[in-house]
Each structure stands twice: as C-alpha cells, then as structure tokens.
Amino acid sequence: MIILAAGKGKRMHSSLPKVMHKVGGKSMLEHVLISAKKLNPSSINVVLSPKIESIKKSFGGYDIAWHSQSEQKGTADAVKIVLPSLKKDEKVLILYADTPLIDSNLLDKFINYMPKSDVKVLTVNLEKPFGYGRIIREQAEEEIISKIIEETEADDLQKNIKECNTGIIFSDVSTLNSLISEVKNDNSKKEFYLTDIVSIANLKNMMVVPLLSKETNSLLGVND
C-alpha cells in the first residue's frame, strides 16, 4: 500500500503540514492510516516531502516505511519512488493522505472488484467537479476507462463530465513499473501525472476498469 502525503497544501493557508490538520480529533493522515491498517496490507508506505519529515514522530505507533520525494515532480514520480522496495508481483493500493473519511469497507470492495483487470480506478460523480480529473469513456455506459484528463488540461466539453477520479488506484508492482516508465511531463504543470497511466495502459491493450462509488462524502479530498 502506498499513501501519498507529499502535497504542499498551499490552499490550506497554514504553516501546519496539510496532512496534519485534524478532522474529528485526529490528523488526516492518521485517519487514512487507520483505514489502511484494517485491510491488513503487507506494508504501508508513506511518501513525504523532506520539508515535513518531522511529522514522522507523530506516528511511532504505526509500522510505516517512509519515503522522501525530494522534488515535487508529480504523483507518478511519488509512486515510482516506492516501487523498487516492493515485490514485483505485489498488489498495490494507492491512497491519498488528504481523504480522511475514506472507508475501509469501500476499499475492500474496490480491491476485490473485477479481479482480472490490470488497473482499477475508484471514481465518483460530482455535481461540482471543478479541480478533479475527469473520467473519459469511449461510450457513457462502457465499463472501460480510456483516459483521465486533469482539470488543467481539460477542454470545455470534458469539463462538463461529472464522473471524477478520486485518485485511488489498484494495480500490481510490475504493471505500475511498466506504465509509469512511459509517463511524460508534457503538460501545463510539467509534472508526471499518475493518471496518465490509464491512457498508456489502453495503448498496451490492458484492461482499466472503474468502480463508480456513491459514497461521495468519504471520497472527497480536503483542500481548504
């Protein structure tokens, strides 16, 4: 399991690291760790920015492998940092530390959904999807995702799409290595987007399937 926690959280307007802001008396990262532990993963890997490594001492009660993303090169780069420490056939659930309400039962359902797929993406319909990556299907009812387009790269038509990427992805180490190695940073932010693995997987004739969840509130990230 990989938890991405290296985001700067500029919109929080606070000197406190984003993932350390409290929700219901616990930090956002601790909420995600609690849900993660319930799934009994073989390992929990958390990716941090070097600037907030001091938060490690707050999680001494958890068995965590910490990883440092020295430069903010994007989510694909953050995952790439962890992969060499994992077994090639290991299954990987990718979570974000700023989704504190994520439910372990939903994650368990997601992990076991469509077991023969190569990549799984947890999605949600939002009435106000601004800021989220949009899910692109060749046909509206099709059970295969062709690509995920980030808000900053989407055209006006794509911005009208309500189905959004939660960021939660499930695959295996070998597949992720293969796909991430081909991710490029030719976008407006010059970052390596993890979402680009979807279109790359399609080019490789891999099966990328979405699980559209109705649990909207538990899947929303915290930005302010």
Where is each model-derived feature located?
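Short beta-strand/turn micro-motifs composed of small residues
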Residues: 5, 48, 96, 123-124
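Conserved core of the sugar-phosphate nucleotidyltransferase
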Residues: 62, 102-188, 195-197, 206
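N-terminal nucleotide-binding beta1-loop-alpha1 segment
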Residues: 1-14
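Catalytic donor-sugar/metal-binding loop of nucleotide-sugar-dependent glycosyltransferases
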Residues: 199-213
